Design a protein with these regions (language model features):
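Auxiliary Fe-S-binding modules of radical SAM enzymes
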Residues: 1-106, 110-115, 266-275, 282-372
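Glutamine-centric residue-chemistry signal
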Residues: 43, 132, 158-161, 328
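Short linear Ser/Thr-Pro motifs
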Residues: 89, 130-131, 214, 237
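Generic beta-strand structural signal
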Residues: 94, 106, 124-129, 137, ...
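Canonical Radical SAM [4Fe-4S] cluster-binding loop centered on the CxxxCxxC motif
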Residues: 114-157
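Conserved alpha-helical substructure of the radical SAM core
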Residues: 146-175
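Conserved AdoMet/S-adenosylmethionine-binding subsite of the radical SAM
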Residues: 164-343
Length: 372
């Protein structure tokens, strides 16, 4: 077992391990096994993650001995993710559709600034990244689960999204939100491994406090995250301030109702000494009433949380819609009048079908139609 994460068991796993799934200490262990000097591990990490390099094959690691490169190629895979489509937006938000090595499709979204996360304008470039292929949690308003759940992403596939977007755009990502396809905390071990690579000085070097995980409400995993050493931020996809409303649109609420979820949140805030964010998608005639706003204010005040209001991004084939701008503003005003720090997300991506999973679903259906 390595400090801060589970070690890869090289003897049990038959398939090749991707080189970008390894922590530096694991690389150092393999380097020793190959009877190479310890500094070779750092050289490999530099080739993988440093901006000027970021090679895509072992052959490109030109300062490593040829025989050593051959051994690495025999021992490890070097997977790539391919960009299938990029959709731009008039507000410069861009959505990326990736094809993985096994043919599965996933999405990421590049957001040039994320005021709703910080409460003010920001020059940061944020990537909204995926953690699973599809989703098993079946939120009624979300496109990610419409085609079901396929598998968890490996650590390297999570990290690769960030590097692929940086490579394509030439822009440095300095903020990551795991709010794309999938339930991040249902892929806990792979995600923690990926975050350690993203956070490490030898990796992508992005500070833990610039990394936010979102969860639909897996109470045990929230408590597990609270006991992790990583100081990442946590956002709760709440979307309903009562069990009645939340249960209509989020099946997870039947397993972990608000009492269980909020108890886990309370444990998290006491352990981490961090402020939570409640993500709240405003859906017309479902969860946008003044009563829901008042009840949400009570919950947020109790936990010292801030609220990020998100007007619903419509999904083809689903009946939901966003409230009027006036209703959105009224909901926000009730929260603020109740003493809750709250923001209403500015329009970013509505014109590029930026709802989670929508581009993947449209592309898959188009391919199925073309081949049927």
């Amino acid at each position: 077992m390595l400090a801060g994460g589970k070690a890869v068991n090289f003897n049990v796993i038959a398939a090749k391990i991707d080189i970008k799934s390894l922590q530096l200490a694991e690389l150092e262990g393999k380097v020793r096994e190959f009877r190479e000097p310890k500094y070779r591990a750092r050289q490999i990490a530099d080739w993988l993650y440093q901006n000027q390099k970021r090679v895509r094959s072992f052959d490109e690691m030109t300062d490593l001995p040829g025989e050593f490169r051959n051994r690495l190629a025999q021992e490890f895979s070097f997977s790539k993710i391919d960009i299938v489509r990029v959709l731009g937006s008039r507000d410069t938000t861009r959505k990326f559709l990736f094809r993985l090595a096994d043919g599965n499709l996933i999405e990421s979204v590049l957001i040039p600034a994320s005021p709703a996360l910080y409460g003010s304008r920001s020059d940061r470039r944020t990537i909204c990244a995926s953690t699973q292929v599809g989703c098993a949690y079946g939120c009624k308003f979300c496109a990610s689960g419409l085609d079901g759940f396929s598998r968890n992403l490996a650590a390297n596939e999570i990290v690769d999204q960030i590097m692929a977007v940086e490579r394509e755009t030439g822009e440095k990502i300095d903020n990551i939100v795991f709010m794309g396809m999938g339930e991040p905390l249902a892929n806990f071990d792979n995600l923690m491994r990926a975050i350690r690579i993203i956070n490490a000085p030898w990796g992508l070097g992005i500070g833990a406090r610039h990394i936010t995980l979102s969860t639909s409400g897996l109470a045990p995993q929230i408590q597990k995250l609270a006991d992790e050493s990583l100081q990442v931020r946590l956002a709760i996809s709440l979307h309903g301030a009562t069990d009645e409303v939340r249960g209509q649109i989020m099946p997870i609420n039947r397993r972990y109702n608000l009492d269980k979820l909020l108890a886990a949140c309370d444990y998290y805030t006491k352990r981490k000494k961090q402020r939570l964010t409640f993500e709240y998608i405003l859906i017309a005639n479902v969860n946008d009433s003044p009563e829901q706003a008042r009840k949400l204010a009570v919950i947020a005040r109790r936990l010292g949380a801030k609220v990020n209001l998100i007007p619903y991004n419509t999904v083809q084939g689903l009946q939901w819609s966003r409230p009027s701008p006036e209703q959105q503003t009224q909901f926000l005003s009730i929260l603020r009048a109740g003493g809750v720090p709250a923001t209403l997300r500015r329009e970013k991506g509505h014109d590029i079908d930026a709802a989670c999973g929508q581009l993947r679903l449209q592309t898959k259906r188009a391919l199925e139609t073309a081949t049927s």
